[in-house]
Curated annotation (Swiss-Prot):
Main function: F(1)F(0) ATP synthase produces ATP from ADP in the presence of a proton or sodium gradient. F-type ATPases consist of two structural domains, F(1) containing the extramembraneous catalytic core and F(0) containing the membrane proton channel, linked together by a central stalk and a peripheral stalk. During catalysis, ATP synthesis in the catalytic domain of F(1) is coupled via a rotary mechanism of the central stalk subunits to proton translocation. Component of the F(0) channel, it forms part of the peripheral stalk, linking F(1) to F(0).
GO molecular function, one term: proton-transporting ATP synthase activity, rotational mechanism
Assembly and binders: F-type ATPases have 2 components, F(1) - the catalytic core - and F(0) - the membrane proton channel. F(1) has five subunits: alpha(3), beta(3), gamma(1), delta(1), epsilon(1). F(0) has four main subunits: a(1), b(1), b'(1) and c(10-14). The alpha and beta chains form an alternating ring which encloses part of the gamma chain. F(1) is attached to F(0) by a central stalk formed by the gamma and epsilon chains, while a peripheral stalk is formed by the delta, b and b' chains.
Gene, per the UniProt record: atpF
Protein's UniProt keywords contain DNA-binding: no
Domain of life: Eukaryota
Residue ranges of the TM segments: 27-49
GO cellular component terms, semicolon-separated: chloroplast thylakoid membrane; proton-transporting ATP synthase complex
Keywords carried by this UniProt record: ATP synthesis, CF(0), Chloroplast, Hydrogen ion transport, Ion transport, Membrane, Plastid, Thylakoid, Transmembrane, Transmembrane helix, Transport
Compartment(s): Plastid, Chloroplast thylakoid membrane
Note: In plastids the F-type ATPase is also known as CF(1)CF(0).
Protein name (record): ATP synthase subunit b, chloroplastic
Record organism: Citrus sinensis
Length: 184
């Protein structure tokens, strides 16, 4: 233990080396200090700085690659969307053309069916008119016939007396009797 205490005692007895102070001579000390500090910084900082720059460079390159991949994906999606748009536009044009031709066809069919219906109605009308004319003619004929018959009956009744009537009946009976004998 004596050795340990001797060493502390010897530290106390050391002489002081000079005083601590600032050297204000710029040309004598600062360029040397600066070159030493710069040398130490360059020697030790070069590795750290190059690692930082390499990491930054890798992150930037990865970001660029990711951006390029995203750009390629976006371009592919854009091309697909444009292709779908062109396809849909073509289909829309076809629907439009087909729709117009279908409308024209339906219009033509409707006009034709309307003309056919009008022709049928015209035929029905003409048939109805003809039927009504025939009916009217038949009614007029019946009335004329009835009036002529009534007129003839009236004339016969006024012209015939009982004696003429009996003679006509007898003559007719005789004719029927002769006819009966011929047939028997």
């Amino acid at each position: 233990m004596k050795n340990v205490t001797d060493s502390f005692v010897s530290l106390v007895n050391w002489p002081f080396a000079g005083s601590f102070g600032l050297n204000t001579d710029i040309l004598a000390t600062n360029p040397i200090n600066l070159s030493v500090v710069l040398g130490v910084l360059i020697f030790f900082g070069k590795g750290v700085l190059s690692d930082l720059l390499d990491n930054r460079k890798l992150r930037i390159l990865n970001s660029i690659r990711n951006s390029e991949e995203l750009q390629r994906g976006a371009i592919e999606r854009l091309e697909k969307a444009r292709a779908r748009l062109r396809k849909i536009e073509i289909e829309a044009d076809q629907f439009r053309v087909n729709g117009y031709s279908e409308i024209e066809r339906e219009k033509f069919n409707l006009i034709n069916s309307t003309y056919k219906t009008l022709d049928q109605l015209e035929n029905y009308k003409n048939e109805t008119i003809h039927f009504e004319q025939q009916r009217a003619i038949n009614q007029v004929r019946q009335r004329v016939f009835q009036q002529a018959l009534q007129g003839a009956l009236g004339t016969l009744n006024s012209c015939l007396n009982k004696e003429l009537h009996l003679r006509t009946i007898s003559a007719n009976i005789g004719m029927f009797g002769a006819m009966k004998e011929i047939t028997d």
